[in-house]
Amino acid sequence: MEPVGPVLPLFSLENQGFPVFFSQGTEAEVLQRRSMGNGQFIQLPVPKGPHSVGCTDIMAGHTKEGSFFRLYYPCDPEEGEKPPWIPRYEYYQGLAEYLKRSRRWFASLLNMAFGDCKVPATWNARFKANETYPVIVFSHGLGAFRDESASTTYYFESLPKPTEHDPTSKPQKTSSTSSSPPPSPSPSSPGSSLQEKWLPYRKVEGEEFEMRNRQVGQRVDECVHALQVLEDLNNGHNVDNVLEGGFDLSMLKGWMDLHRATIVGHSFGGATAIQALAKDTRFRCAVVLDGWMLPLTDETCSQVQKPIFLINSEKFQTQDSKERIERLCSQNSQSRVITIKGSVHQSHTDFTFLTLKPLNVVFEIKGTIDSMLGLDITNHAMLAFLQRQLDLQKDFNKWDDLVEGLGEHLVPRPAPSQAGP
């Protein structure tokens, strides 16, 4: 079982005082990375906040009912190995199948394009026990994986773990003794009692709603379970990590502010965030990045009474989805929705920074808005919203205008209709 959605656990957010948030870095760093011409990035943006970033993988139980996620957290500054953005070759094969391309040649092409890309976080770095940190659970989209939105979220554990019943998952591990980042002992190593099982991508024929609705319920359960694992760790309970990683989970005891837990998701993960907000009262609010509304029932949407912030791209939402989003927002006076000009559905993912021109022509992964600018707008708007909802003692309210839909790079909201005389 493999993470299917990010669980952004631990610890706060972006830059100005929050631990992480992969953002653009200095102008010199940005220019240095534009070595492929036409402003194309060949690696992910580096963090620019006050905290260095560490990460580790956690598998609490190795069955379908277990939790498998990546945890990003504030760490002490140190040199160390950076995990690969795409951890195993099987992921390239899964991406190829999801994109309806040749598993053989297109996977090799993806490997050549992205094989050297690293996540800008230090593997198994020592946790920075400096203050209690809010917790974010992040859930990614279909055909994605735990690193797919590293640059767009704060800290997260990429949680979701597709099972045989997840028709959209690319190959995933159902059990393993090796973590995905830096090389580690394989399940076939002496003394290992577990075996890997990769789940091939399954296409959905015909009407999608029934399958996707079941699937989003499973993803919600996984996010809730991951949050429970974090709560257990925070309370000092022993959590047996099946993976051999070397990170001391006991260091996390008492440092997570679970009274300030929220859930964030992109696309299908956005639908997950909406349903999770209705299901688990521990989540105080949700942020939805271009959420895919199809898997959700109207009944589920009507149960969401807490604040929700939807950040949409310009081209993805249908008219029906827009109407459902408006009804969803009307259920809480603190809920908001904004649309970023020139953005596309993948603008909220790492692919927008890494995609070469030929791939973008075919798959429209980059919008007309500069990728770094789009990331900054998303990050700043999220931080301003979260400061409101989580009572953060920061200065993120300087971006409140973005939450209200005001800014040159936001699509103006239509004026409310005026009643007749």
Q: Which residue ranges define each predicted feature?
A:
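Alpha/beta-hydrolase-fold serine-hydrolase catalytic core, especially in secreted/extracellular enzymes
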Residues: 2-32, 181, 351-421
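Domain-level recognition of soluble alpha/beta enzyme cores
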Residues: 21-135, 391
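Glycine-rich His-Gly loop
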Residues: 73, 138-142, 267, 313
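Short, solvent-exposed beta-strand-terminating loops
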Residues: 75-93, 151-153, 187, 336-355
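Short substrate-entry loop that stabilizes the transition state in hydrolases
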Residues: 120-133, 138-153, 164, 172, ...
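The feature captures the conserved acid-bearing segment of alpha/beta-hydrolase catalytic domains
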Residues: 127-128, 284-348
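Alpha/beta-hydrolase active-site loop
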Residues: 154-258
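Primarily recognizes the serine-hydrolase "nucleophile elbow" in alpha/beta-hydrolase
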Residues: 228-302
